[in-house]
A protein has these predicted regions:
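Charge-rich amphipathic alpha-helical interaction elements
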Residues: 1-112
Length: 112
């Protein structure tokens, strides 16, 4: 195998590894956002139960719900952005992996 082929394969492998790490990081951020959304949903149920049990808490429930809706829409927007970012990262990883396989194939053919 020639030096240039080894260099191309090494660079392509590094790019694939970097993109895999990026995809894992995006997945972690997405899981965190999904957890925040689940926590928000659980919190609103707790507040609704508290409002049913306590008249004073019931009067404050509407203000809480307004804030909750805002926080929920923010998290949902973050999730939408993360989904788009994840799709882009997957596409980039697919392309980088295809390039790596092309270089490996050319190197194998040049060895024969």
């Amino acid at each position: 195998m020639t030096t240039w082929a080894r260099s191309l394969i090494r660079i392509s492998t590094y790019e694939v590894e970097t993109l895999q790490k990026r995809l894992a990081e995006i997945g972690s951020r997405r899981a965190s956002a999904e957890m925040r959304l689940a926590v928000l949903d659980a919190e609103v149920e707790i507040e609704r139960e508290r409002a049913r049990a306590d008249a004073e808490a019931g009067m404050l429930l509407q203000a809480y719900l307004n804030g909750w809706k805002h926080r929920k829409s923010t998290v949902e927007a973050d999730l939408g952005e993360l989904e788009a970012e994840e799709e882009g990262a997957r596409d980039a990883l697919t392309g980088a992996f295809e390039e790596l396989k092309k270089f490996e194939h050319v190197a194998e053919l040049s060895r024969l």
